[in-house]
């Protein structure tokens, strides 16, 4: 079978070693004669899977002991509701930074529960899309929390600063597309959430990291399945969790630890992004319209100078084993998502193809 590199934005490529282990264990896990998908989530065998996954996740991110880790349903969109329902308390407003599509989606959901103070951080610098630095964000005086999305997968825009607003500001962040891809100081945040389907594992699982002093504040109308306190008190098993996704994510955590952890991922991700952006910037045939300071390392959108060639590019790249390069319908063009599981070899293969395609069609 020919090598295929999957550049999908999510569900995304998983480490080949993890897939092979899951394949090997699929029908007979731990000698039980059954699949891990079939065993009880309350049995001692799966409890061990769950505990090891949380421990490895904590180790990878050096999560402080005063933070709880929840394994949840609902994805990022579920947390768009979960954040206000758990954190508003007796306040009626919260600060929301809008830097792109997913941040705006969080704002839309927040309007159901509060009056969001929307901080429009989108700017244009020398004709390129960019984001205002955090020092220019105008926070309100009585906000229950601040919400932002550091990496916009559709727009290819990233906020590389980590928040430093002081202890009075409860910072919440959607890290679905960047978690485990580089250094992260968890102590700067009140709540971090991430859908698993990009850098953690398969779709269906969402991880929430919540500072323990923020528990116990959920609105009385908050569904129990979104209530952080209920989930924490029940060890993320208030109802049957997505056990197979939890198991696979645990395998990914072990793969990460075996391969140098977050520090090594950070190094490789930087190499991949630099290679791809340098190929785009060194050509008049391809272009990226994001300012260099705000370019995403995970999601690289680019356009061809002649959009009439888009269909040909996608057909030829797919035939070459380079899959899922079509850009999101909102922005068009192409997009290469290069999360942790994408090896440097995959980006090398893509850039070689891009150079050759330009030679033949430019």
UniProtKB/Swiss-Prot annotation:
Entry's EC annotation: 2.6.1.52
InterPro entries in UniProt: Aminotrans_V_dom, Aminotrans_V_PyrdxlP_BS, Pser_aminoTfrase, PyrdxlP-dep_Trfase, PyrdxlP-dep_Trfase_major, PyrdxlP-dep_Trfase_small
Subcellular location, principal: cytoplasm
Pfam families on file: Aminotran_5 (PF00266)
Keyword Amino-acid biosynthesis: yes
Assembly and binders: Homodimer.
Function: Catalyzes the reversible conversion of 3-phosphohydroxypyruvate to phosphoserine and of 3-hydroxy-2-oxo-4-phosphonooxybutanoate to phosphohydroxythreonine.
Name listed for the protein in its UniProt record: Phosphoserine aminotransferase
Organism: Enterobacter sp. (strain 638)
